[in-house]
């Protein structure tokens, strides 16, 4: 059966080829093409370090796109992006961190897995300087991921040079809008992933709906391909000692996969995201590991009493861990349905989990 392109009249086909050639001469190869002729229709992704979140995102953070991660203070925003940086570095990629808040802890970044010796870092004085650095890094096509921490700290030069208390209406919003227009095209061409961390503010006088909003105006919301809302939902304890938090991430916007999915995972103090915790949760949901009462079993053999002991068993047996992870990934690739809308939802607490 002839395709639609074959059915085009010869004179139209000739005129079309002529104008396509002219456009490519003027603007470069790839400036315009048939969608089916694109070399890569499938968007490549970067792992977040949390298998549950990768699943909710449809594979991970998309390359060559703008991503916004927002949430309350100490919810895990920086930890999540440091894990993404570590994953890029494991693949031989180059990462940059624009530390507008001047708060990056190199010791913690190392504990998460970041190679700080090869991490590019900038601590800009103004918002204009920060975004110009981002634009130049993106246009170089030599950097694979750039993280900006945070939008709220991108203070316009006019505000810094002005007096305390001066009314500076909409300066940051205009700055972000101009930056988005400038860098978005370059991001797509270079394949660089740009992640903006953002803070929450309260809207005054809101009676209905959520009073929460993000800083920096509306531009980032429109230009971002993925928006992640991360919240701390639980404090993890062993007895009375706190050792981490449980985080919940909602995919508020996703242009490359179905949105509104939710993922949960543990963040351990001083260590970052618990990758083994994510693996145990998904192994249970996909049926690779079964749970009866407090006991977790694999192929009929008990491997741990309680979730924490099961995680320890996987940590002590790397070959077994690799087998479980392979089976989980195979089931997820085949479209296995998880038991809940929330990916990696924490199981009900058992007596063993409570005592440990």
Curated annotation (Swiss-Prot):
One GO cellular component, as annotated: cytosol
Q: Name one Pfam family in it.
A: RecA
Q: Which GO terms describe its biological process?
A: DNA recombination; DNA repair; SOS response
MF GO annotations = ATP binding; ATP hydrolysis activity; ATP-dependent DNA damage sensor activity; damaged DNA binding; single-stranded DNA binding
Q: Which CDD domains match?
A: RecA
The record's listing under PROSITE patterns reads: RECA_1, RECA_2, RECA_3
- Carries keyword Methyltransferase? no
- The keyword DNA repair is annotated on this UniProt entry: yes
**Top-level taxon in the UniProt lineage:** Bacteria
Family as reported in the entry's similarity comment? Belongs to the RecA family.
Report what the protein is called: Protein RecA
Gene that this sequence comes from: recA
